[in-house]
Every structure is written in structure tokens, then in C-alpha cells.
Amino acid sequence: MLNFTLRSFAIIVTSLAAAGTLAQSYPSQPVRIVIGFPPGGTTDVIGRLVAQGLAESLGKSFIVDNRGGASGTIGTAIVAKAEPTGYTLTVVSSTHGTAPALYSSLPYQEKDLAPAGLIATTPYVFVVHPTIPANTFQELLALLRQSPGKYSFASSSPGTAQHLGGELVKRMASVDMVHVPYKGTGVLLPDLLSGRVPMMFENVAIMTPHIRKGSLRPLAVSSAKRTPLLPDVPTVAESGLGGFEVLGWFALLAPAGTPPPVIKMLNAEVNKLIVKPSVVERFAALGAEPLGGTPERTAAFIRNEQEKWGKVIRDSGIKAD
């Protein structure tokens, strides 16, 4: 028993020493950041900003690897199963908060991941086609109450923030509108702009050009406060649904077991990066705002999102598979 105890103690000491050495030399080789979505989307843009910033501050390449599919869960699973050395990371989006309730099974568990930092949030804006006879969100709710089930709203796929935002409006306002899911924002835009599906929540940066052209009318934004991109558009909460908040968000995760000093370093670098003026300016163009905070805050934030949307998804009977 004594020999076993001494061996166990020696293993622990050796492991701690190795972790300390790794942290001191990290990164000594290129780091891969897996993005669970195709190039060009908001998650990809945010991920590339983080990769570029970390490469500049830490002096090694941070290479983006796009592995799209299943609302980002395929990419997340790659990282969850990677060696916990800090050389395989992922930037996840708010779909990470909905996936556990949306899918009957996932190729990873939350305990397989180590939160490293919160990056940013992005609001959504509820837009309607100009043919909809409503100039305010309150007028829209009155219209929906007068004609339950008559009007439809679009989303880029089931379980996304666009979809769940609509479901939350239905629950909080006691209105009925029909969900029409698509396979991506690019696919749904022609129908939205033509009025075939006349309303939806969508990323504010994506919708702003169409709003400025007069092709779509903004009624409310989904964040708790107004967005600088559309300062005259009230929030949903201001418009009668107090407490309403739906945000896109992005976080940096590593495999569970990544040495704490490496997590601490990544967290510090992310917190410094997201307040740099050049990054804040890029965020502003996306309608995004820096988040930041400790790894513990990141874990609590993700847990709260999963609990909040898990209830909405289960109560609404939404499934992605």
C-alpha cells in the first residue's frame, strides 16, 4: 500500500511538473482553432479575429479549421476528443447553449470541454416585410392576436436563435405564428425579401443593409439594450415583453484536462484582445459587443444558457433529429 501511495504521489508530481513546463513554453507550435460552421458566417469571422489576435500576441500561428455541420456540434466533438494540450481549441456560438436539448444525443458531453473565455455577443433584430401592416412591435403583436396562425416567421434552421426567439415571443405574448425553417440564411433571404415568409429574427449586421434600403422594416432588437447599428429601434423588452433577451454569443473552449495555466493564459489573452480598439471596431461592424470574464464566468454563462433554452425547447417540443 505504501509503495502504491508513493507511486501515485510521484505520478501526480510528475504530471504537475509537466503541466507547468507546458504552460511556460506554450505555445511552442501552431494551434488549431476548430470552427463548427462554414467560412463566412459570424462565428467564422469572430473565430478568425480571435485566431489572428492570439497569433499576434503569442507569436505562433493559430490556424482556423472549419468543420461545419449539425449546428456546430461536429466541430465541438473534434475538440472534446482532442489531446488536452491547448493545441486544439474551438470557438463555439450560441448554438452550444441549445444543442443539449435540441439533439437526442451529442458526440460529446459538456464535461469533456474546458471553458477558456467569453468573446462577444451579437443581438438579433425582428424584421417584417413592408407589406405587413405593423410599424411597431406592439402593433405586430396586436395583429398576431387578431389572426392566430395566419402569419409565418422564418429561421435558418430549427433550434437556432432565430427560431427560439420566435418561440419565446409566442410564449411570452401568447400569440400564434407558424415557424418555417430553412437550411441557412442565404436560402431564406429571397423568400423574406419577397414577403413569402414575411418576418423573422436575424443577426443585426446581416439585416442592416436591407433595412437601410427599405426592403425590410425593423420592429425591435432582441438584446436587453439597443444596438448602435440601429439606435432608433427599441428592444423587444421595451416594446412590451419585459425581460425578453435573445443573444448570439461566442466563447473559446479547450478540451477538458487542458492544464489550468494554459487556460489562464488563453483567458487573459482573450480578455486583452476583445478590448483592443481595432477589434472593438470590427465587432461594431458586426453589431457585436465584447464580453470577457474568467473561465468560471464562461462556464456559468454557458450553463445558464443551456438551462434557459433547454426549457423553451422541451416545452415547445422542438427536435433537430
Model-predicted regions and their roles:
Residues 1-12:
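Bacterial N-terminal signal peptides that target proteins for export
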Residues 18-20:
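N-terminal signal peptide c-region/cleavage motif recognized by signal peptidases
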Residues 23-112, 150-152, 174-203, 210, ...:
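N-terminal (or domain-start) structured segment
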Residues 28-30, 172-175, 212, 235, ...:
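An extracytoplasmic/periplasmic, membrane-proximal ligand-sensing/linker region
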Residues 45, 49, 53, 74, ...:
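Extracytoplasmic/secreted proteins, especially bacterial periplasmic and envelope-associated proteins
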Residues 81-87, 101-187, 236-238, 249-282:
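Hinge/capping helix and adjacent helix->loop/strand transition within the periplasmic-binding protein
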Residues 95-103, 163, 170-172, 199-233:
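A ligand-binding cleft/hinge motif common to bilobed small-molecule-binding domains
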